[in-house]
Amino acid sequence: GGPGCGNGNNGNGNYGYGNGNGNGNGYGNSNGNGNGCGPDGKGPGCNSVSSAGTLSSYGQVVGSNVYSANGCGPDGKGPGCQVKPLSLPKYFFRKSSQYPRRKNCSPNEIGCN
């Protein structure tokens, strides 16, 4: 993957309070440094109090701890990024395919629509 598609491998896990700061290298030159989600589903990296997933933000790697968090790269990609509901593909149908215009065809021309 390119920059930003990264799993952060290092993080501080606090089992008692469920807070964990997740720091880790992403693929390419992106570093996934962010907040972890504790094993009790709580912490700054959790989607909600009952979620076991992690969210993290882009940053530099700090430390080398044992628990993991997912990294979100600067391009908004990676397992730690929130899914954006309006992220549509950046291509559109050509108008010519939506609204075909009749060509000037000679009566016996083959393959002219």
Curated annotation (Swiss-Prot):
Component of the organic matrix of calcified shell layers. This is Gigasin-5. It comes from Magallana gigas.
